[in-house]
Amino acid sequence: TFLPLILECQNSYNLSLLGTYDWNSTEGNDIWGWVDPADESEYALVGLVNGFSCVNVTNPSNPVEEFFISDLSSTWRDVKTWGNYAYVTTEANAGLLIVDLNDMTGNTYWNIFQFNNPSTGQSTSFTASHNLYIDENGICYIFGASSNNGSNPADGAIFLDVAANPTNPHYLGAWNDEYIHDGMVRGDTLYAGCIYTGNLYVIDVSDKNNPATIGMHPTPNAFTHNAWVSDDGNYVFTTDETSDAYIGAYDISDVTNIQEVDRIQSNPGSNSIPHNTHVDGNFIVTSWYRDGTTVHDVSNPHNMVQVAYYD
């Protein structure tokens, strides 16, 4: 995965480049945004092959790297935030990296491998994981976990409480029916991309000790990479990480009877691969291999319309 920050413009429509930052000797694999509540400075939190970078993009025409944390080499490194902390997963055996963003020297961070629950005595450990999501309640969902130390963590979703203690998250439970590649959560519902079964899963996570699958639907190209729910909660959008695949749109107003309502490609026949799609109001913003970034108007999810792109 390469970052829009470092792409040279080949063609565009309704999107324009504001600035670039080049790490020269490495490549990017994920990006997330964070706004400092103290002064509203804006930062790009970037997963790189060789570590984690925090870039000040308050002036987008002149981005400045604030700090870099070196880590084990990996093609996969994903970032999310809770409060003033960044949480970073990787498929290298580096555990969960927690970075204190109050310290812009980059010297305050932890690599956590073991997660306990003092109240229940339950625990889990992992050394690697593919991705993560943190919901509005401060619950962190670890996806695709694995271990090289003999433990056997859930590779579906592990639930951690980062709100109570951001630097020492407590283990709450897990869902382990299928491997989850990526997902997002709103309220008590997890929308999961189960890439190896090619299905969107909808999971009730209100009881972290007993999560329950409440809906499931195959995606167009049977390699479900990510899922993101609409603001009104009635629709979900998915990507399949394979050549010439579609973005899918689904009516989930009744999760026991999910209906596909539309699908759309970026550039049919080009072997372009959709990676992640995210909802922004009435639009979805999608990153692609080969085709850069696209924006679709999904005010009518039954008829998604591409309205912008940048490559």
State each model region's role.
Residues 9-311:
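Feature marking well-ordered beta-strand scaffolds used for ligand recognition
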Residues 1-10:
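Sec-dependent, cleavable N-terminal signal peptides
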